[in-house]
A protein has these predicted regions:
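Extracellular adhesion/carbohydrate-recognition regions
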Residues: 19-112, 116, 181, 193, ...
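Compositionally biased non-globular segments, especially hydrophobic aliphatic-rich helices
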Residues: 12-14, 19, 151, 169, ...
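Compositionally biased, low-complexity segments enriched in small residues
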Residues: 3-7, 68-71, 78, 82-83, ...
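Disulfide-stabilized, aromatic/cysteine-rich ligand-recognition loop
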Residues: 198-223
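An exposed tryptophan-centered "aromatic clamp" motif
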Residues: 102-115, 121-198
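N-terminal low-complexity, intrinsically disordered "leader/linker" segments enriched in small/polar
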Residues: 2-25
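Short, flexible loop/turn elements at secondary-structure junctions
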Residues: 59, 123, 188, 219-221
């Protein structure tokens, strides 16, 4: 089962790497340049924001890779909110051949920052909600997110979320998530599967780890 605990590591990780907690003034508009990438929203607990989420530039942080080279169990990597820990768990469990997605994100140095990671399930969902590339109708069977700010207790409607207002992330934009394309989260669903989300209608599924879907690295800073 996904683990809903243990998201509070980013500040310490950034300090350990000699990076500042505040790389820029606090962001106010979805999609604005911030912290080596682009502001994607906030994540928190019980509606209280704890971190700003930052999506990396598409040209350097978006790629197609396998979650794992085999459909076997992973130690850890089951949190829905702690992408840094999930990524660290995979990096510790095997090399880049075993965990291509996690190592790709972990090894990035972009915008002067080296604390990029593979987003956990609820982090990836926030990216979809705020940076949806198309005007396609949404599925209504998923979308609730206890870690969104504000909390979303209900699933999507066909029209909410709408296409993002951030032009660079809309279809055809330089920073868009590939439309109607599957993106891996770092959250393990079972010993053989991991969770992924389709950046079209917002479908959420679990599937075999040894399939190459896209991954988009993110980072976060404390509010």
């Amino acid at each position: 089962m996904p683990n809903f605990s243990g998201m509070w590591t980013t500040t310490q990780q950034m300090q350990a790497k000699g990076q500042s907690i505040w790389p820029d003034p606090p962001p106010s508009v979805i999609g604005q340049a911030f912290g080596g990438g682009y502001y994607a929203g906030q994540i928190g607990v019980s509606g209280t924001a704890t971190h700003y989420l930052i999506v990396g530039p598409a040209s350097s942080t978006d790629s197609a890779k396998k979650w794992k080279d085999a459909n076997t169990a992973t130690t850890g990597a089951d949190s829905v909110i702690n992408g840094p820990q999930n990524t660290a768990d995979m990096v510790a469990d095997g090399n880049s051949t075993v965990y291509p997605c996690a190592h790709f994100c972990n090894d990035l140095v972009v915008g002067g920052f080296s604390d990029w990671y593979m987003p956990a399930l609820n982090e990836l969902e926030i990216c979809f909600y705020n940076l949806k590339p198309s005007t396609q109708n949404n599925v209504t069977t998923t979308g609730a997110n206890a870690n969104a700010v504000p909390v979303r207790a209900s699933n999507y409607t066909t029209g909410i979320p709408a296409q993002t207002s951030a032009v660079a992330f809309q279809n055809g934009g330089s920073e868009q998530f590939a439309n109607s394309t599957s993106y891996w989260s770092s959250t393990e669903a079972s010993s053989t599967d991991a969770w992924f989300k389709i950046f079209g209608a917002g479908n959420l599924y679990q599937y075999s780890k040894n399939v190459a879907y896209r991954v988009r690295a993110i980072r976060r800073v404390a509010v």
